[in-house]
Curated annotation (Swiss-Prot):
Residues 1-12 are cytoplasmic. InterPro entries: Antenna_a/b (IPR000066), Antenna_alpha (IPR018332), Antenna_alpha_CS (IPR002361), Light-harvesting_complex (IPR035889). Belongs to the antenna complex alpha subunit family. Its main location: membrane. Signal peptide: none annotated. This is Light-harvesting protein B800/850/890 alpha-2 chain. Residues 34-47 are periplasmic. It is found in: Cell inner membrane. The keyword Transmembrane applies. The lineage of its organism: Bacteria, Pseudomonadati, Pseudomonadota, Gammaproteobacteria, Chromatiales. NCBIfam families: pufA_517_ASD.
Length: 47
């Protein structure tokens, strides 16, 4: 494992992993907001 960190900068890798997860979370939320049954902002709150 230490050889991998000699090639990759660990700070940049951690930042890119967090940015990637944030983009994925936003993408999932916007996909759910675009559907009619999973839109919690304009949908029916009781099902």
């Amino acid at each position: 494992m230490w050889r991998m960190w000699k090639i990759l900068d660990y700070r940049r890798t951690v930042v890119l992993a967090h940015v990637g997860m944030a983009v994925l979370a936003l993408l999932i939320h916007f996909i759910l907001l675009s559907t009619e049954s999973f839109n919690w902002l304009e949908g029916n709150p009781y099902g």
